[in-house]
Structure formats: C-alpha cells, structure tokens
Amino acid sequence: MMHLLADPETWVAIAFVILMGLFAYLGVHRMVLKALDHRADRIRDELAEAKRLKDEAAKVLADYKTRRASAEREAEEIVTSAKAEAERIAADAKAKMEDFVARRTKAAESKIALAEAQALADVRAAAAEAAVQAAATVLSQSVKGGLGDDLVAKGIAEVSRKLN
C-alpha cells in the first residue's frame, strides 16, 4: 500500500474525489446547472427575438414589394396617360392647323375670285368706254350738224347705260 501512496496519480485521484465531495457539499453543481439554465433561457429568448425580427423583416419586405409593384403600375399608368394626352393634343393641333389652312385657303380663293371679278368688270368698263369713244368718233365724222350731235349724244348715253 505504500507503493500506492508514493504514486502521484493516487494523490491526484484522492484530491479529485475530495474536491468533488466538497463541490457536492457546497452545492456547486446546482449553481452550475442554474447558470447553464439561465444561459439556455437567454439563448432561447434571443432565438425568439431573432425569429420575431425575421418575421417582421419578411413583412416589411413583402410590404415594400407590394408598394414597389403598385408604384410601378402607377408609373406605367401615368406614362400611358401622358402618351394618350400627347397624342390627343397632337391630333387636336393637327385638326386646328388643317382648319386654319382650309379657312386661309378659302379666304385666299375668295379674294382671288373677287379680284378676278373686279378685273373682269374693269376690262368690260374699259372696253365699253373704248367702244363708246370709237362710236362717238365714227358717228361725229359721218353725221354733221346739230341733229347729228344730238343723235350721237343720245346714242352714247344709251350705250354707256347698257354696257355698264
């Protein structure tokens, strides 16, 4: 047995048994279990909080995606509406321009017709005046005397009245 007392491993085993007994007597194992339970509870709470935050983040992400899709649809509607409005404005402007051109053309044609009619009237008046002058000259040379002058004056007045 002496041989066992000289062996350092024996003393380590005896010290270990005494230490474990002392720990058991003082209730160290309860303190360790309590600390481990406390740590497990804290980890469980952190996991629950992490799950809650994950769920909340998923809801926020879903809300963001919904809002983004809604905003994209709204933007497309705005673009479509703007294109339709631009096309309507362009068509309206084209119609107004065509109407303006048609009115201007009609007014120009009316002015041209009026000018033609005036020119024709002026030409007729000039022709009538020339015919009257020619007739007066011919008659005055062929008929002499007071009666001739009278006839020439009446004839000129009648021709002027009928031609104008």
Swiss-Prot record:
Recorded GO CC terms: plasma membrane; proton-transporting ATP synthase complex
Residue intervals passing through the bilayer: 8-28
Superkingdom of origin: Bacteria
Family stated for the protein in its record: Belongs to the ATPase B chain family.
Physiological role: F(1)F(0) ATP synthase produces ATP from ADP in the presence of a proton or sodium gradient. F-type ATPases consist of two structural domains, F(1) containing the extramembraneous catalytic core and F(0) containing the membrane proton channel, linked together by a central stalk and a peripheral stalk. During catalysis, ATP synthesis in the catalytic domain of F(1) is coupled via a rotary mechanism of the central stalk subunits to proton translocation.
Subunit structure, interactors included: F-type ATPases have 2 components, F(1) - the catalytic core - and F(0) - the membrane proton channel. F(1) has five subunits: alpha(3), beta(3), gamma(1), delta(1), epsilon(1). F(0) has three main subunits: a(1), b(2) and c(10-14). The alpha and beta chains form an alternating ring which encloses part of the gamma chain. F(1) is attached to F(0) by a central stalk formed by the gamma and epsilon chains, while a peripheral stalk is formed by the delta and b chains.
Protein name: ATP synthase subunit b 1
